[in-house]
C-alpha cells in the first residue's frame, strides 16, 4: 500500500498570505543555518584557544549551547515548510479521501493548539527573564532574555507555518498529508 507524496515543499499557489509565510519560514531557515555555522566557528575558536594557546575560555561554551538551541527553535517553520518532520502515512493511506481530509484537519488543529500553548508559555517565560533582567550565573553573565527570545519567536513562526498549512489544505492548494488521491 504505497502512496505518491507530492509534499516535498509546502505549496503556496498565488495566495499572498501563504507566500508571505513561506518567505518568513525560508528566512528563519537561513537564520537557523547561520546560527549553526556560528556555533561551529565558535567551537573551533574555543578548541584553538584551549588546546593550542592553552588559554581559558569564558563565553564560548554557553554561546554554542544557546546558538544550537536557538537554531533548533528558529528552524522549526522551515523544516515544516519542507515537510522534513517525521511523517507516518500508513493510516492516511488506508483512509478514503473524506476521512483523510478529516484526519488532516484534526492533526493540524491539534498541532496548532499544542504549539499555541507552547508559544504562550514560552512568551511568559521570556517576558519574565526580560522583566527581571535575569543573567546567567556564569562569568560571561549573558542577559538571558536574549537567547530565550528564540523560544517565542521559533514557536510563533512555527505556529504561523502550521496555520498556513491548514489554510493551504482548506483552500485546496495542498492535499491532506501531501498524498495524491489514492
Residue spans for each PLM region:
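Alpha-helical transmembrane segments and membrane-interface helix-loop junctions
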Residues: 1-182
